[in-house]
């Protein structure tokens, strides 16, 4: 049975003071024992968060990492090995904001995915379609291509030590949310694509939904058979709301 997971992506939010306040809120949460919980703070605050959450069962990850696994001459980048040294266990790869705003392409993301795994970081691969692509009926084509790029380059076995997050771009920060059935349909297609290559990997990989998840809709979303938790954006900046989402995953 797949263990549920709830991950909070803080994006480019926070100051030392507000992060300290959020850490304090997280420390006081009663989290369900059967759920893996993680947060992805801005890189400047990773050490603060790791230190502040010591003794709490919350993993800390990075929002981005370099295409090379080891430190070297890549100005402005952070190597996966450095993130491991700092205490991170996870890293986001291919978030839609990286794909669409920063122009990251599948070939670059394949390298980031591989470099992370080479250092012992577990990548959380983000896939998803824009509103235009959904309205054109291309959702499964787009998601399948994003997923297939990793499979073709690294093999389906790479997902034995990874997480996949489906995040429809049109539902991120807009207040819009895919219906539970819409999300389930895409998650089922992702699992089927993996199963066509390796059924064991497909059964074991956790698929998270990301896109305006809140405590109010989490129970219904997480009740779908192929949705194993959530990648939470804005709601993760409120400790009480985030805790309620974690408890929904535990149910």
Swiss-Prot record:
Annotated catalytic residues: 95, 167
CDD domains per UniProt: TIM
Pfam families: TIM (PF00121)
Pathway(s) where this gene product acts: Carbohydrate biosynthesis; gluconeogenesis; Carbohydrate degradation; glycolysis; D-glyceraldehyde 3-phosphate from glycerone phosphate: step 1/1
GO MF annotation terms: triose-phosphate isomerase activity
Binding site for substrate: 9-11, 173, 212, 233-234
GO cellular component terms, semicolon-separated: cytosol
GO biological process: gluconeogenesis; glyceraldehyde-3-phosphate biosynthetic process; glycerol catabolic process; glycolytic process
Catalytic activity: D-glyceraldehyde 3-phosphate = dihydroxyacetone phosphate
Primary enzyme class: isomerase
Isomerase as UniProt keyword: yes
UniProt keywords, alphabetically: Cytoplasm, Gluconeogenesis, Glycolysis, Isomerase
Quaternary structure annotation from Swiss-Prot or TrEMBL: Homodimer.
Record-linked PANTHER family: TRIOSEPHOSPHATE ISOMERASE
Function: Involved in the gluconeogenesis. Catalyzes stereospecifically the conversion of dihydroxyacetone phosphate (DHAP) to D-glyceraldehyde-3-phosphate (G3P).
Family of this protein: Belongs to the triosephosphate isomerase family.
Name this protein carries in UniProt: Triosephosphate isomerase
Organism of this sequence: Pseudomonas fluorescens (strain ATCC BAA-477 / NRRL B-23932 / Pf-5)
Primary gene name: tpiA
